[in-house]
Each structure stands twice: as structure tokens, then as C-alpha cells.
Amino acid sequence: MNKNPVILNFNDTLLHQSDVDLLNGPHWLNDNIITFYFEYLEKVAYLGEKNLLFISPEVVQCLKATKASELSVFLDPLAAKQRKFVFLALNNCEIMDKAGGSHWSLLVYSQPEETFYHFDSLKGTNYKQAAKLCGKLLKYLNPNGTGDFIENDALQQNNSYDCGVFVLCHVDLLANYSLQNNRISGCGWTTQEYVKSKRSSILHIIKNLQSKGY
């Protein structure tokens, strides 16, 4: 008997029971859950929306390990230069070829503003990682290789395990805001209430997709 069965097979993402269990309690969210949610945004919530790009943790790790001159290998197939807003799930893992790390944050590129915004629920924790990746990506995304980097104020977590949940809440807020306002600046904050409800919200999404045969 498989003790860790596949719960959901959604496009390019497989969720096992151990992944889904992370949503049921006070647990740190792993790469698989965040990748699933980013894919859900792309394939369901914002299906057909060409102005938004959601880049999964696995691809972000590859970008961190790749020379600026070679980023096109990963980003050209995603049409990154044609997107107005690019969302990257950033981890502080220093081992470039495997999953890991202890903290998630969100890096967002706003093409209309030529600016990277970093949203960190433990402000300063992933600053070094975000600034380094920003400098590399600007050489690819902006023909002039120039742009700004802003460590944005954001709602702060009060525990050691909700950073991934905060990333997903930030994505929800910013994706909607950016489409309505054509910018990231002035976006405001997510709320503690929204953060508290996010795990159950994702579980509901998973059950809904299961009912559709995924």
C-alpha cells in the first residue's frame, strides 16, 4: 500500500498526500505546494492573461544558478520579455541544484515601472538573494539593463512557518492590483485574516480540481 499516494495530477504538478498534509496544520509550505498554486493561477485563475507570468520555485533556482548571458534558455520559452508583470517565488536556498532553504519571499518585476519589488514577510531575510537575482534579471528583461529594486513594506508573519502562505497571499493581491492599475506601487497590504484563511482556501481548490478529474 502506498503510504504517500498522489492526491492531484494537475498539468505539470503532482501533489502527494505529504504535500497536502502541509496545508492542514502549522507547517512550512514546500516547493510542490507553491508550484501548484502558481500553475493554478496561470492555468485557471488567469487563464489566457498574457500580461502576467508566474515563475515556479524550481525555475527560480535555475535562474539563480545561471549566468545572466544564459537566462534566455529558461525565460525565452516563457515569453518573459512580453509580460508586464513577472512573479517569482524566491527561496533562500544556497544549494542551486536542489530544493531546500528555510524562507520564502516574493520578487515581482513591473515592466511599466522598470522596477523589481521584493515582498518579504520577515523583512530583510531574503534581501541579499532578491537583490542579486534582480541585478541578473534586469540585464535580460530591460534592453538597457537598468531598473530599480525596492524592498517593499509588507505584512509580517508572527511565526516561523507561514512564509509560503504569505507569498501566495501577496501574489493574489498583486496580480489583481497590477491588472487593474498597470503598476505595483501603491498596492497596499494583504491582511492577517486573508493569511489565516489561505490554507483552507487552497485545500478547497485542490478538492474542486479533484472533482473535475485531475
Pin down the residues of each PLM region:
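Cysteine protease catalytic domains with a Cys-His-Asp triad
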Residues: 1-105, 109-115
